[in-house]
């Protein structure tokens, strides 16, 4: 196990194209960090710099307080699990898991001991003689994880390891990875674009956007107190409703196209009064037929126990997440107009109109 640190790490490609704009972060011994963000945000580039597959343009990466910028990948004592498994098709499961240890010239008895121990952890004991073509997608991914485990590295790197699996297998493998980390407690860096993976796996998550860490925090910190409109719109399904509003000195709120919101001034903090800001409301923290604003229903998504009600209020689209029972008690249908508003139990979110950052102190 080890600590992992980033000191003003930057990456620029040829032509002076910046990809990573400067990251400072400390990962504690045994911590599971998930880097999440949309395609092109720099998350995989950051992972590859830790692995030694990309050079660091500026700054330092440290493993156990030792700068590793100039070390070869094999010298960093890390193990990486890829999206596409990267198994040798002509080798058995045992040989795939043992290959890296053979390259390092470990004794045969030690190799067998490590492979069998990893196989027991991952429930691969009966599959050691099979070739990859005889395995399911989930089994292949477990073999890839087993190959990483036997190295007994200081740091695990996971590069979107579940992206090739179907929805059911992804759930199962998330649980496998959780159990694996609790058992081994190895420092881990995990890259994904899937917010569900980030929320369920991470001790802390790093939300990346355009090469910049928008927010670093525990999953619930990021969900309950997003640092920017980007984070608010990226974390949460459906994402947070964001309305451009003008707030009067008396706490009365109007949308940017002049529609009044029937919201108690008591819910409007002093920091945003007399200003133009962005107001955020989580879909699950809103109610149908509640004080707020009138919206025309444009679409209803049925998810079994829940309904997603999409409504238009002027130029803004708003989504309400409600139970099927609550929706069945509401006579409104597509094309009808009804009032929707905050449930009063959860605070509203407020962001700066120009920067998108959360209003300070809220």
UniProtKB/Swiss-Prot annotation:
Protein name (Swiss-Prot/TrEMBL): sn-glycerol-3-phosphate import ATP-binding protein UgpC
Cellular component (GO) terms are: ATP-binding cassette (ABC) transporter complex, substrate-binding subunit-containing
Q: Which domain of life is it from?
A: Bacteria
Family indicated by similarity = Belongs to the ABC transporter superfamily. sn-glycerol-3-phosphate importer (TC 3.A.1.1.3) family.
Pfam families documented for this protein: ABC_tran (PF00005), OB_MalK (PF17912)
Indicate whether Cell inner membrane appears among the record's keywords.
Answer: yes
Q: Which reaction does it catalyse?
A: sn-glycerol 3-phosphate(out) + ATP + H2O = sn-glycerol 3-phosphate(in) + ADP + phosphate + H(+)
| Enzyme Commission number(s) | 7.6.2.10
GO BP, one annotated term: glycerophosphodiester transmembrane transport
Q: Which GO terms describe its molecular function?
A: ABC-type glycerol-3-phosphate transporter activity; ATP binding; ATP hydrolysis activity
Q: Where is the signal peptide?
A: none
Q: What does this protein do?
A: Part of the ABC transporter complex UgpBAEC involved in sn-glycerol-3-phosphate (G3P) import. Responsible for energy coupling to the transport system.
Which PROSITE patterns does this UniProt record tie to the protein? ABC_TRANSPORTER_1, ABC_TRANSPORTER_2, UGPC
* Keyword terms of this UniProt record: ATP-binding, Cell inner membrane, Cell membrane, Membrane, Nucleotide-binding, Sugar transport, Translocase, Transport
How does it associate, per the subunit comment? The complex is composed of two ATP-binding proteins (UgpC), two transmembrane proteins (UgpA and UgpE) and a solute-binding protein (UgpB).
Its topology with respect to the membrane? Peripheral membrane protein
Residues annotated for ATP binding in this entry:
37-44
Q: What is its main location?
A: membrane
Query: Has keyword Protein biosynthesis?
Result: no
UniProt source species: Bordetella pertussis (strain Tohama I / ATCC BAA-589 / NCTC 13251)
Give start and end of each ABC transporter domain: 4-235
Q: By its UniProt entry, which InterPro entries does this protein fall under?
A: AAA+_ATPase, ABC_transporter-like_ATP-bd, ABC_transporter-like_CS, ABC_transpr_MalK-like, ABC_transpr_MalK/UgpC-like, Mo/tungstate-bd_C_term_dom, NA-bd_OB-fold, OB_MalK-like
Task: Name where it's found.
Answer: Cell inner membrane
């Amino acid at each position: 196990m080890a600590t992992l640190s980033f000191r003003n790490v930057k990456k620029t490609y040829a032509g002076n194209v910046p990809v990573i704009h400067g990251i400072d972060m400390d990962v504690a011994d045994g911590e599971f960090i998930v880097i999440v963000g949309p395609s092109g945000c720099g998350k995989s580039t950051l992972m590859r710099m830790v692995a030694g597959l990309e050079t660091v343009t500026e700054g330092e990466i440290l493993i156990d307080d030792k700068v590793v910028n100039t070390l070869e990948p094999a010298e960093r004592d890390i193990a990486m699990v890829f999206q596409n498994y990267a198994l040798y098709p002509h080798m058995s499961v045992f040989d795939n898991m043992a290959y890296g240890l053979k390259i390092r010239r470990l004794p045969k008895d030690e190799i067998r001991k490590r492979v069998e121990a990893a196989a027991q952890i991952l429930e691969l004991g009966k599959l050691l003689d099979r070739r990859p073509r005889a395995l399911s997608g989930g089994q292949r991914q477990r073999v890839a994880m087993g190959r990483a485990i036997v190295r007994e590295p200081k740091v695990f790197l996971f590069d979107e390891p579940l992206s090739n699996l179907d929805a059911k297998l992804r759930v199962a493998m998330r649980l496998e990875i959780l159990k694996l980390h609790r058992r081994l407690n190895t420092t881990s860096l995990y890259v994904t674009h899937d917010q569900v993976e980030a929320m369920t796996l991470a001790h802390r998550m790093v939300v990346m956007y355009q090469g910049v860490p928008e927010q670093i925090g525990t999953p619930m910190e990021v969900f309950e107190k997003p640092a920017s409109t980007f984070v608010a719109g990226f974390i949460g399904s459906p994402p947070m409703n964001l309305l451009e509003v003008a707030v009067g000195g008396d706490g009365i709120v109007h949308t940017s196209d002049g529609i009044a919101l029937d919201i108690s001034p008591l819910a409007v903090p002093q920091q945003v009064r007399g200003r133009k800001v962005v107001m955020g409301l989580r879909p699950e923290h809103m109610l149908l037929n509640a004080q707020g604003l009138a919206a025309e229903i444009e679409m209803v998504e049925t998810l079994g126990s829940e309904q997603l009600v999409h409504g238009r209020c002027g130029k803004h689209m708003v989504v309400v997440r409600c139970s099927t029972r609550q929706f069945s008690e509401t006579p409104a249908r597509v094309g009808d107009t009804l009032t929707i508003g905050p449930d009063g139990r959860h605070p509203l979110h407020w962001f700066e109109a120009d920067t998108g950052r959360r209003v300070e102190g809220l």
